[in-house]
Amino acid sequence: MGNGGSSSIASHVSVDFAKVAKVNCSTFNNANLITCFANDYKYENWVVEAIKAYSSKKDLFILISSSGTSKNIVNAAQYCKKNNIDLITLSGFKKNNPLSQSG
């Protein structure tokens, strides 16, 4: 899961996981979902609320942010960490950023 280009990467990776590794996976990149949750919970919280609504403790979340500072992605990483939900974070621009410190 990510924003902008990171969302596109997440979407492509999820297809590869399903096609090659036969792993059931999905992304929360549906415009209706994003706009509904962002409207109801604020943009910085929509990913956390989507995780609460659609996930189980068996899920693994991959959160991507080039900068590592996207508030909605960082909040989701912190929520996963706090609730013992398996998590992988990917970020790139700076080594020490809030996202890399969460995952």
Q: PLM features: what roles do these ranges have?
A:
Residues 3-103:
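Glycine-rich phosphate-binding loops that contact phosphosugars or nucleotide phosphates
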